[in-house]
Amino acid sequence: MKTAAQIRELFLRFFEEKAHRRVPSSSLVPQNDPTLLFTNAGMNQFKDVFTGREKRDYSRATTAQKCVRAGGKHNDLENVGFTARHHTFFEMLGNFSFGDYFKKEAIAWAWELVTSERWLAISKERLAATVFAGEGTLPWDEEAYRLWEAQGVPPERIHKLGAKDNFWAMGDTGPCGPCSELHFFQGNDIPCAEEKAGRTCQGVACDCDRWLEIWNLVFMQFERGADGGLTPLPKPSIDTGAGLERMAAVVQGKRSNYDIDAFQSIIRAIEKLAGKRYGATDADDDVSMRVIADHARATTFLVGDGVLPANEGRGYVLRRIMRRAIRHGKRLGLERPFLADVCEAVMEEMGGAYPETRENRAFIVKVAGQEEESFRRTLDKGLAILETEMRKAIPPETHLGKPATPPPSAPRPVIDGKLAFQLYDTFGFPLDLTRVIAAERGFDVDEQGFDRNMAEQRARSEWKGSGEQAVGDLHKQIASELGETRFLGYEAPTARAEVKALLANGARAAKAARGDKVEVVTAATPFYGESGGQVGDQGSIAAPGGRVRVEDTRRPVPGLVTHVGVVEEGELAVGDLVELAVDDRRRDLIRANHSATHLLQLALRETLGDHVKQAGSIVAPDYLRFDFSHFQPLSEEELNAIERRVNELVRENAETETAVLKLEDARQSGAMMIFGEKYGDVVRVVRLGPSKELCGGTHVRRTGDIAFFKIGSEESIAAGVRRIVAYTGPQAIELSQREADELRRAAALFKAGAFEVAQKIEQTQKRVKDLERALDEAKGKIASAQSGDLAAQARDVKGAKVLAVRVQGDGKSLRELADKLRDRLGTGVVALGAEQDGKAILLVAVTKDLTARLKAGELVKEAAKLVGGSGGGKPDLAQAGGSDPAGLEKALAKVQELAVAALG
């Protein structure tokens, strides 16, 4: 039996023999494409090649591409585990032609690879093809039909389908074209919903799995703009996609993707953890194992590509995937963290094809473990919220000391749909879990309200691109017309160039006048456009009849540089020969910070370990910011070591070396790369002493030009990601001086030398603690004296004492007094109320022998409503606060009333 790994290799080798370049998978985080949430097709990394905006040194390519469909338009999340085919993560095998071959070769090679005994050896008799039937002004694809006939496919197995099935587009915009699919017949014994409804199975067009699509050949001929219009591509091209999991299922004779070897190895790891067998008798267990296997794959690869759990964007989708897996783990009875272990099984299965997963193993395992621990705590909070809301829905006297259940004679209360959705969205509760818990307690759930909130959330979370700098059609048009802007800024801060295009006040224009907000495009420029974390340059453009103040420099589409600013004098026109001048003093500050960022990354890896990976950066003139993977705060010793190491490298004054190399040569040289970054075939390598990185930014001539490096702050910004903000040169000196000034000021206040300040602070802290201890002792004596008097006021209820009284003091003194009173009462309930700083304080204590009948937390919650507040706590001790101290007497009376009712 051919394994999935062997099928992947056969596919790639087949096309290598057809003169295709084997190109590595791109990151799951799309580069330079704000229209995509995740990479979801093999052609994503070639989008600009298809549109002619990017050139490669090859015209044929083949890939095995990592893909995720779990958010935005392409969202398979909720189906995963319940069907044989749906996945969040999958591999897309593909071959591509960039204006080279077209339909004839694509169809012939697809047929050869699928049917040849040398390759995949799938039975010809079980294959069918589809072609575009035509729609609107687009004609049917007769050429593809004839080409399938030429391969020996009988006419009755070549089907014409409409645009819904046979016109492919990556998204709302971008490359598209008619397509032709290969389908594999699995058998008429597979159930069909159409037949169950008394209709006829639709064959290759049916949603049942009798005919399984295994390969889609897209004949890339158009680009769809934001207005929906189709523009012919410069050269017709080919984009094909074959899901590895589906192809492996067919080759291995499996009906479900989850039965192929690549999934079964992961499922075996889950079986071992759960002590259960996949495919035994419990269908729900099988669903959960499939969910966990799929979601562990998505987790492994998304985290490996730098996506981290978060509350928005890509991180939010990852968090939902991980939490869905964890929920299904609990369904399997996995009470201890397990997701990291399953991710290890994924890396074992797939690390050979994707070595980056093994390289990032420690990072992936740590993120998975931390998120699971966090979510398990969150899940418990969700259950507590649900319990609280159910208690609110029924009279408190019916549930004190026991789960909230309405009386049998009462109408069934309803859990609000908004709450049910909050539990789903925030705490990971699927609706069916809320429904089951509710039904056990005699509650119903407002499912229509849940659906309404779900629809609103989907509308909010729909991926609309990455913001105001999303690619615009005008920039695309200009880039298509003019090609790449030559960058001259490595050599000099000034240059002469012709104005090739102009945007004035957001519209394309031939000229611009004083006061106009403009984007100026020139044939070449010394200005660096914002990229790689380095901010764009500022400066000026001098024209024969005017002057532009350049406030920013951007790269709105790959290769195109625009100078953003305002016409300060006269006017500017397309065709003008202009003088471009970068603000070189500002550029020098940026150079120093950028070079320091490289040295900082080196020092971090030397000090903390090779798990440190760049997760983001900003290089500005006045500071640098560097985000990196690490799982705990840096100690003072580590921060000092990092700072010392960078300054050592600065003092070495090593000369900066740059080289332009082929990507593979750069990789072999050991140059640091940002994993997931999209690099061209030729890259620039920057060497600063022992630091060597791929980088297109501007740098100092020697490390000594950085002058001085100073860390300003270090903090956490996400699970497993830390952030350092640092300064160089004048800003670093200024920060050091400010710190020294503050130290001198503190020394003066303590009447001590600068190096004695820490000792003086420790001595002061000790004195404060001693005074607090003495104060507590005094309060304790007062409480003891008070408790004797107050205990006498307690009401006897069938052998238990109930005391509800207003006193003076803060929260701490109330707790001490309550402890004394409980000891004196023996068995009973104590409720104390006090006013402090215009606020109400309530405290309820219940002796241990009564907590089965009375819960302090429930009593204090009811009382808190009467002082305009809320609270909670343990069964034996709880506290609340409120904004209305005038209600204290009523609140204390309420506690006494509830306690007497429960005890009586």
Curated annotation (Swiss-Prot):
HAMAP family: Ala_tRNA_synth_B
PROSITE patterns, per database record: AA_TRNA_LIGASE_II_ALA
Cofactor note: Binds 1 zinc ion per subunit.
SUPFAM superfamilies reported in the protein's UniProt record: Class II aaRS and biotin synthetases, Putative anticodon-binding domain of alanyl-tRNA synthetase (AlaRS), ThrRS/AlaRS common domain, Translation proteins
Major localisation: cytoplasm
Gene: alaS
Phylogenetic lineage: Bacteria, Pseudomonadati, Myxococcota, Myxococcia, Myxococcales
Enzyme class: ligase
EC number of this enzyme: 6.1.1.7
Protein name: Alanine--tRNA ligase
Domain notes: Consists of three domains; the N-terminal catalytic domain, the editing domain and the C-terminal C-Ala domain. The editing domain removes incorrectly charged amino acids, while the C-Ala domain, along with tRNA(Ala), serves as a bridge to cooperatively bring together the editing and aminoacylation centers thus stimulating deacylation of misacylated tRNAs.
Gene Ontology BP, a term: negative regulation of DNA-templated transcription
